[in-house]
Amino acid sequence: MTSNRMQTGHPADGVYFGLMSGTSMDGVDGVAVRFEAGKPPAVLSEAFVGFADTLRDALFALQQPGGDEIEREALAANALAARYAVCCHELLRTAGLLPDDVRALGVHGQTVRHRPERGYTRQLNNAALLAELTRIDVIADFRSRDVAAGGQGAPLVPAFHATVFGSPDETRVVCNLGGISNITILPAGGGPQGEGHARNDTVRGHDCGPANALIDAWVERHLKQPFDDGGRFAARGKVDETLLAALLDEPYFRQNAPKSTGRDLFNADWLDAKLAGFQHLAPENVQATLTALTAATVADEIARHAGDCRAVYVCGGGARNPVLLDALATALAARGLDAAVATTAALGVPPQQVESLAFAWLAYRFNARAPGNVSTVTGAAGERVLGALYPR
């Protein structure tokens, strides 16, 4: 096979890979995509590579302080790079590409600590090893520059959302239901802008609270399953309003944006502390209540910041949970919002591709030396070029 790298209209144009392993820590999603100035992204292939239980356990253990962290982090980073490389080779195979055909690989890494209030965020990955294993330029560590500029370092996807999901006619909200929920508010008048931003001065967004991080943890504890398949465990239960009120009594939910969160706060220890006094509840009722918590916190933030919203488009793992989507629609209606709930597939982008596409796009922005953050979202001092390059 010979290289088919295109000569394109912008120096940064070409094929990029994007890899995303989220807070579920079950594996890595990857996409191969072609970016050309003024055109929508063209997905060439996608892949998913799972993580072994040993790696997943190691990553979960690194979420909290513990012994010998430097050694454990380094070994986990090497193991992650190996799995990321497998995903890249699968993308090369299915897209019929050679490494030289790929301009760069944008990789998020695995968040193990996110503490912007202390001036750091840690996405685990051995980017040098990944470049060695793939022979592709690797662009990594996207969040640190935003944090260095005084921002939250998250969410970073709103700039990409504005690029592909904006509308000239209606205010839209893009809601990512990953381990943590976050929203991007796209006021009417933006519209997709090809490779550029869609009116960054009006784009807003922030993390809302826990989503699959707690939902998955509870179902794994009681059913030994990695996630609530189709929301069926929650559907068997009934929301306990007293427990829901206790869960909602969390200072983060009252905090003003910009704000971001993660497993540093919303983890099994947080949940167990909240469940004190509720041991009598059936596990399925707790699951139903955790699902309602996610819906309520997202709906509260949309009602507070995007009352004119007419459409909510969901991506992330939660997009495959119809019980959660129904709960979100109900919660929005209860707050007086006439907003339809659908997945991003309705806008032409499968929900499982959105975040990996975003990090491919951030790599594209890096090569163009163009900013990748939205400072009104993260609170950074201004827009910045995000990422660090590890050449092939």
Curated annotation (Swiss-Prot):
One of its GO terms (molecular function) is ATP binding. It holds the Pfam family AnmK. Its EC number is 2.7.1.170. It is an enzyme of class 2 (transferase). It catalyses: 1,6-anhydro-N-acetyl-beta-muramate + ATP + H2O = N-acetyl-D-muramate 6-phosphate + ADP + H(+). ATP binds at G22, T23, S24, M25, D26, G27, V28, D29. Keywords: ATP-binding, Carbohydrate metabolism, Kinase, Nucleotide-binding, Transferase. One of its GO terms (biological process) is 1,6-anhydro-N-acetyl-beta-muramic acid catabolic process. Pathway: Amino-sugar metabolism; 1,6-anhydro-N-acetylmuramate degradation; Cell wall biogenesis; peptidoglycan recycling. The keyword Nucleotide-binding applies. Catalyzes the specific phosphorylation of 1,6-anhydro-N-acetylmuramic acid (anhMurNAc) with the simultaneous cleavage of the 1,6-anhydro ring, generating MurNAc-6-P. Is required for the utilization of anhMurNAc either imported from the medium or derived from its own cell wall murein, and thus plays a role in cell wall recycling. Belongs to the anhydro-N-acetylmuramic acid kinase family. This is Anhydro-N-acetylmuramic acid kinase. It comes from Burkholderia mallei (strain NCTC 10229).
